Amino acid sequence: MSHSLVVVIPDLRAEHSARLREAAARFGFECHICSSSAQSRRFLPEAEVILSADHSLAGQAPNLKWMCSHFAGVDPFLKEGVFASPEAILSNSSGAYGVTISEHIVMLLLDILRRNPEYQRNIQQRAWIRRLPIRSIYGSRILMLGTGDIGQEACRRLRAFEPSFIKGVNFHGNNPGNLFDQVKTPEKLDSLLADTDLLIISLPGTKATFHMISTPQLRLLPGHAVIINVGRGTVVDQAALEEELQNGRLYAGLDVFENEPLSAESVLWDSPRAVITPHVAGDTSLQHTVDRIVNLFLEDFENYCTGRPLLRQIDRSIGY
């Protein structure tokens, strides 16, 4: 059986396809670039490598050896029975989304701090109301849950606004690039929350991060604190957050939710204390993101074909 690479990514340009085909040919792979998952299905029985975020493809590829998600988050791939080939390795595209998602973080923060949703509602009613007190990132105390690519890129951008400090939380306690003023492990999280004005979450959805922010943590935050979540919705206990917002505490900028799409009954749709976007912070219509996805994959594709370890391989037991 010949080696086979199957690619299903939206927004690929011709130059991306050409580079993928060239790399595949160099290492003796047939390359099938498909516009949809449905189109890819006839190639799956012989697929050795798949580049796609559609976890359902892994269950239809009995000869799969490597599944590379073009997303950074891989939680759908971690469920029991997803892979038809249990020994298949899994990797992600961490490093592709830092630019676009960090810009989304800044947008959500400024939207809330500068009261833009309220101004827009007033404008739609042709009401010229100018006296809405605003706040600033300048001088704010920032805590970032997650110090990977997204957290680091956000930290770089937020430094320009001159906050009082930017602290981080990760599972290793290391300070990547010494970007953060201080980094702690999750065991110290509660002790950091009382001194936090802006809480920014970019953590993956894993067993260890499930409801890391729930009622006890929300109650430790100052009432004026802003929570931004661009990681996974399961990191925040959504019901607990909704209750705090309804009680007039906290503000939230959310791109991810516990269940997606967000239920039409959710109070978040109409909450004056929330700004929501429909999981679009990492949208691949930004060509820089697709460029990065392809570059990162080709780097690991060469590693795979030459017997070297993958740089972005996921430990499926912990989810990152």
Model-identified regions with their sequence ranges:
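Glycine-rich NAD(P)-binding loop of Rossmann-like domains
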Residues: 120-153
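Glycine-rich, N-terminal phosphate-binding loop of Rossmann-like dinucleotide-binding domains
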Residues: 54, 71, 201-204, 230-231, ...
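N-terminal glycine-/charge-rich "phosphate-binding" loop or analogous flexible N-terminal tail
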Residues: 1-47
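Phosphate/diphosphate ligand-binding glycine-rich loop within oxidoreductases
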Residues: 46-120
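Rossmann-like adenosine-cofactor binding region
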Residues: 164, 173-267
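Oxidoreductase and adenylate-handling cofactor-binding alpha/beta cores
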Residues: 102-118, 160-161, 295-303, 308
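Rossmann-like dinucleotide-binding domain for NAD(H)/NADP(H)
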Residues: 224, 230-320
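Short loop/helix-cap segments at secondary-structure boundaries that form the rim of catalytic
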Residues: 18-22, 41-44, 57-62, 78-85, ...
